[in-house]
């Protein structure tokens, strides 16, 4: 569930296009399941089920939101026993049915156990920063990752560092580039993966260059 303190004002009602929100969240405690319930109350997309994520983890949340409902600046920080994260973004078209909800912002994590969140033992503590632009039409979101910098990522038992990436993900294709300058792994990968919804045929186009790889050190 969720519990905490929310303070704020809303002006401009009943004119939704001119309605402004100014709110702060302090010492808010929630689980992933509670976050899904909370988001469901504010979006037009119906019930959002996040119960399969971060099972058994409670997050402490502080944040703020300010602006028009369809152009809102939001900041949030999360702290938990599995790491922390901060995000700052502009949310657009929240109440316009003819347009997909949009997000344009930045995300930072510190020692965040991604494996605990998504339910896998392959990846764990991760420290990164990235810019993200996303649209959420019906079906699959369209996501653009700008200047992802991974300072540290525990992946399959090895602690990687020095990773940079950019990419775009949509329902039909992924196109991205990854550069790794880890002490035990130096490589460049650039590739496109496209899936035809009509024929279920996949198209792979990629380029890879491995300068150095110490497999013994990484296993």
Across the structure, where does each feature detected by a protein language model lie?
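Interface amphipathic segments
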Residues: 1-219
């Amino acid at each position: 569930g969720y519990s905490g303190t929310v303070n704020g004002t809303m002006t401009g009602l009943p004119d939704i296009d001119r309605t402004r929100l100014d709110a702060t969240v302090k010492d808010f405690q929630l689980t992933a399941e509670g976050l899904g319930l909370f988001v469901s109350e504010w979006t037009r997309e119906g019930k959002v089920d996040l119960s399969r994520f971060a099972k058994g983890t409670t997050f402490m949340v502080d944040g703020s939101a300010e602006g028009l409902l369809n152009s809102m600046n939001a900041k949030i920080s999360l702290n938990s026993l599995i790491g922390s994260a901060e995000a700052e973004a502009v949310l657009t078209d929240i109440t316009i049915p003819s347009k997909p909800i949009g997000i344009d912002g930045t995300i930072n994590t510190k020692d965040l156990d991604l494996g605990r969140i998504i339910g896998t033992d392959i990846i764990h503590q991760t420290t990164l920063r990235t810019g993200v632009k996303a649209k959420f039409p019906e079906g699959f979101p369209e996501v653009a990752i700008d200047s992802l910098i991974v300072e540290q990522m525990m992946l399959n038992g090895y602690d990687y560092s020095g990773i940079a990436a950019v990419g775009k993900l949509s329902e039909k294709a992924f196109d991205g580039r990854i550069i790794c300058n880890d002490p035990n792994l130096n490589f460049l990968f650039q590739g496109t993966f496209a899936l035809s919804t009509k024929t279920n045929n996949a198209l792979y186009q990629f380029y890879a260059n491995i300068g150095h790889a110490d497999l013994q050190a990484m296993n």
